């Protein structure tokens, strides 16, 4: 007699629209704030990653490193060009991060139902990894065209509109869709899924796991939470960085008559053969600095959820 109501109550908790909506809001607001703050580093990282595949950047005009890029961008393109593509990035990142966080908690409920952390630690740990990876892969399917457009806008150099390849987000999507079809907006999607699972599994899983080991997870001091998040985002970013480099190189091919790479594997091989293994990590230090924004997202998300009095699911 008591089992059926309990089951319905569990289903209601699992698919609570109000809680899901608050998750979207909390994750989205935190993401928008942090991405705007680190937008200049984001652009430097993108340019260093794809300049070898960009027809707009000649070999002699390529950036020598992060410092050279930081100095030349305002001089050649204007100071506010550091935020070029930032609006598209915020639009893209809001649903991406919001969906990641929202789905993560729902997946946690699915994967971790009945799992005792003290008695089944490794099962609990793997459930955290699985929920993070599944959340990232699910949201990527929805927002990939926006991620693609943000990348192309971010590496579109030139001081004036007449020197740029795209006028804005809408123009970028329309031009690529017209020349390559919808498939062109999903160039590099396969390797993106691989990379996002690796990144999100460690990003969410390790953060939740480490925080869960603390005596009072919900009362963790801000600085401690930030330090944990910083270490997690740095390690996750370096681990998945080669996947990110390859996917962005693949993105650069859409809309081009002649393609440099036949596919993901060919891209991996050619980068290694012609540029060396270090090219997979070009811009990685910028990514470490950029990871500060990711760390802020994790911490702000918890604080925003506390503000809305949302249960953080045992963290």
Curated annotation (Swiss-Prot):
- Write one Pfam family the protein is assigned to: Mito_carr
**What InterPro entries does the record point to?**
ADT_euk_type, Mit_carrier, Mitochondrial_sb/sol_carrier, Mt_carrier_dom_sf
Residues that, per the record, bind ADP: 92, 104, 247
A GO term (biological process) for this protein?
male meiosis I
Q: How is its activity regulated?
A: The matrix-open state (m-state) is inhibited by the membrane-permeable bongkrekic acid (BKA). The cytoplasmic-open state (c-state) is inhibited by the membrane-impermeable toxic inhibitor carboxyatractyloside (CATR). Proton transporter activity is inhibited by ADP:ATP antiporter activity.
User: Which keywords fit this entry according to its UniProt record?
Assistant: Antiport, Cell membrane, Cell projection, Cilium, Differentiation, Flagellum, Membrane, Mitochondrion, Mitochondrion inner membrane, Repeat, Spermatogenesis, Transmembrane, Transmembrane helix, Transport
Compartments (UniProt record): Mitochondrion inner membrane; Membrane; Cell projection, Cilium, Flagellum membrane
Gene Ontology terms: cellular component: membrane; mitochondrial inner membrane; mitochondrial permeability transition pore complex; mitochondrion; motile cilium; nucleus; plasma membrane
Motif (Nucleotide carrier signature motif) spans which residues? Answer: 247-252
Which residue spans belong to the Mitochondrial matrix compartment? 50-86, 143-190, 244-283
Region annotated Important for transport activity, chain positions: 247-252
Q: Which reaction does it catalyse?
A: ADP(in) + ATP(out) = ADP(out) + ATP(in); dATP(out) + ADP(in) = dATP(in) + ADP(out); dADP(in) + ADP(out) = dADP(out) + ADP(in); H(+)(in) = H(+)(out)
User: What molecular functions are annotated in GO for this chain?
Assistant: ATP:ADP antiporter activity
Provide the tissue specificity.
Answer: Expressed in brain, liver, sperm and testis. In testis, expressed at higher level in spermatocytes, while it is expressed at lower level in spermatogonial cells. Expressed in erythrocytes (at protein level).
* Placement of Solcar repeats on the sequence: 18-110, 123-213, 220-307
| Membrane topology (Mitochondrial intermembrane) | 1-19, 112-121, 212-222, 302-315
Q: Enumerate the transmembrane spans.
A: 20-49, 87-111, 122-142, 191-211, 223-243, 284-301
* UniProt similarity note: Belongs to the mitochondrial carrier (TC 2.A.29) family.
Q: How does it assemble?
A: Monomer.
Q: According to its record, what is known about the domains?
A: The transmembrane helices are not perpendicular to the plane of the membrane, but cross the membrane at an angle. Odd-numbered transmembrane helices exhibit a sharp kink, due to the presence of a conserved proline residue.
Q: What does the function comment of this entry state?
A: ADP:ATP antiporter that mediates import of ADP into the mitochondrial matrix for ATP synthesis, and export of ATP out to fuel the cell. Cycles between the cytoplasmic-open state (c-state) and the matrix-open state (m-state): operates by the alternating access mechanism with a single substrate-binding site intermittently exposed to either the cytosolic (c-state) or matrix (m-state) side of the inner mitochondrial membrane. Specifically required during spermatogenesis, probably to mediate ADP:ATP exchange in spermatocytes.
Name of the molecule in the record: ADP/ATP translocase 4
């Amino acid at each position: 007699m008591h089992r059926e109501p309990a089951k319905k109550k569990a289903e209601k908790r699992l698919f609570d629209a109000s809680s899901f909506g608050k998750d979207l809001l909390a994750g989205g607001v935190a993401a928008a704030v942090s991405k705007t703050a680190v937008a200049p580093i984001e652009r430097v990282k993108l340019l260093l990653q794809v300049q070898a595949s960009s027809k707009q950047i000649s070999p002699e005009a390529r950036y020598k490193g992060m410092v050279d890029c930081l100095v030349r961008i305002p001089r050649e393109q204007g100071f506010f060009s550091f935020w070029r593509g930032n609006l598209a990035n915020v639009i893209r990142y809001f649903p991406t991060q919001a969906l990641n966080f929202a789905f993560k908690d729902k997946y946690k409920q699915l994967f971790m139902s009945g799992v005792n952390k003290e008695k089944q630690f490794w099962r609990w740990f793997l459930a955290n990894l699985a929920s993070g990876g599944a959340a990232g892969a699910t949201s990527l399917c929805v927002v990939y065209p926006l991620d693609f457009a943000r990348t192309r806008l971010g590496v579109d150099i030139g001081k004036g509109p007449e020197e740029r390849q795209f006028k804005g987000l809408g123009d970028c999507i329309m031009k690529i869709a017209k020349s390559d079809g919808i498939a062109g907006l999903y160039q590099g999607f396969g390797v993106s899924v691989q990379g996002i699972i690796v990144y999100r599994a460690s990003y969410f899983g390790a953060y939740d796991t480490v925080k869960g080991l603390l005596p009072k997870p919900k009362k963790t001091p801000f600085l401690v939470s930030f330090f944990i998040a910083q270490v997690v985002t740095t390690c996750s970013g370096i681990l998945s960085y080669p996947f990110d480099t390859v996917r962005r190189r693949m993105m650069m091919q859409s809309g081009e008559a002649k393609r440099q790479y036949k596919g993901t594997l060919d891209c991996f091989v050619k980068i290694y053969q012609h540029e060396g293994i270090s090219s997979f990590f070009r811009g990685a230090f910028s990514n470490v600095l950029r990871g500060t924004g990711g760390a802020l997202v994790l911490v702000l998300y918890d604080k925003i959820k506390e503000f809305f009095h949302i249960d953080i699911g045992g963290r």
